[in-house]
Amino acid sequence: MDKEHLKKNLQEKMEKALKVLDHELKGLRTGRASVNLLDSVTVEAYGSKMPLSQVASLSTPDARTINVQVWDKSMVSSVEKGITIANLGLTPATDGQLIRLPIPALTEERRTELVKLAHKYGEDTKISLRNIRRDGNEALKKLEKDNVIAKDEHHSLSEQVQKLTDDYSSKVDSVIKQKEQEIMTV
């Protein structure tokens, strides 16, 4: 593995870690309606489990409601059951093929729990970034040992890997700070 490929590989892995964090944070309920809350909901449909988005269209008519428009009338009870089983703290209100999900306001205690969880996700991501950095530094040592790069070049590349790690770590901090503000906004 050459040094350019190594840097590109490290950057891709760090970008992937950031995407995982984004996905985890989207699942946190902020008191504001978002169809992403229902990403984890699966529905028993046509003999198999399917994501909710494959049997209904999802929309947010206002900041406190999610509408689930079920395409097949026979699926309404399955969709309700799937939403209830997902344990999201949402109570489905059915009106024909339309299921309304009012988003209850978050209590101060629940907001604090969500902020702690967001920080935990952030810390897990930083641990991933440090592991990626460690793997990169080990690969650099191997390149130096195999005489592919010189000692001073190894030092320079190590600094670049550290800078890359610092950059992504600060991105994680800003994403978490933004999510914290979103959660704490009443």
From Swiss-Prot:
InterPro entries: Ribosome_recyc_fac (IPR002661), Ribosome_recyc_fac_dom (IPR023584), RRF_sf (IPR036191). One of its GO terms (biological process) is cytoplasmic translational termination. Its main location: cytoplasm. It is found in: Cytoplasm. One of its GO terms (molecular function) is ribosomal large subunit binding. Keywords: Cytoplasm, Protein biosynthesis. It comes from the Bacteria. The keyword Membrane does not apply. One of its GO terms (cellular component) is cytosol. Gene3D superfamilies: 3.30.1360.40, Ribosome-recycling factor (1.10.132.20). The keyword Protein biosynthesis applies. PANTHER family: MITOCHONDRIAL RIBOSOME RECYCLING FACTOR PSEUDO 1 (PTHR20982:SF3), RIBOSOME RECYCLING FACTOR (PTHR20982). Belongs to the RRF family. HAMAP family: RRF. Responsible for the release of ribosomes from messenger RNA at the termination of protein biosynthesis. May increase the efficiency of translation by recycling ribosomes from one round of translation to another. This is Ribosome-recycling factor. It comes from Rickettsia peacockii (strain Rustic).
